[in-house]
Amino acid sequence: MVSIKLAEIPVQMNNRYPDLEYLCQGYETGEKPEISLSVSVEELEKERSMQDECFSDGYLETVCMYRKLALEALAHQVFVLHASVIEVGGNGYAFLAPSGTGKTTQTRLWLEYFGEDARVINGDKPLIRMIKKDDSAEFMAYGTPWQGKEGMGCNAAVSLKAFFFLERAVEPECILATQEKSIDCIFRQLLLPEKTEQMEQLLEMIDIMVETVPGYVLRCNMEMESVKAAYDTVVKQ
């Protein structure tokens, strides 16, 4: 059994294999769980059938467990976003793009450009929590043990200030996205639930988020000038 705290939620994961315990080191908590999860043998086999490669049962259990957490967390106004979130000067910026477009490259360029002022919160699948404040809302990005192939991230949280929707280009350019563009890009990076109630919970959060956190189309290359284009448009304001 693994007891951890993610996005302010104490979670109990009833695991069969040690992989999960190793993965979640540094996130442990002694608080009473608000969510309890387990993965059945049938769910493991279903996950195996969805994979192109051959993975151990222990690894597949970690994948299944995070997917189940993503769905259960919706009731706590938390969802998983396929993105790389970096913190610069206390503010959070999320890079969204199809796999292979350059999220990791841009993340590393930002780390190089901003040096000690920057850190990666989660390089692959952060948890996003909506915190309502009277007539407004804040969206916090949280690090998790699930950090992708590169293993970039930490057990920390940051307030999201902007989304960058990455597109490859020769000459860098950063422009404000419409809300319709933001919704389209964000939806492509979500785990969509099958249950109606969970889908309604997710849709409400996304609607509020695109009204609260601005999105930008960042046409970028693999050079530092892409960071400067984003910085001049968003970060230094």
Which ranges hold each PLM region?
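Hydrophobic positions on the alpha1 helix immediately C-terminal to the Walker A/P-loop
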Residues: Q106
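A noncatalytic interaction/capping subdomain that flanks phosphate/NTP-handling catalytic cores
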Residues: M1-S99, L109-A118, L127-Q237
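Conserved lysine of the Walker
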Residues: K103
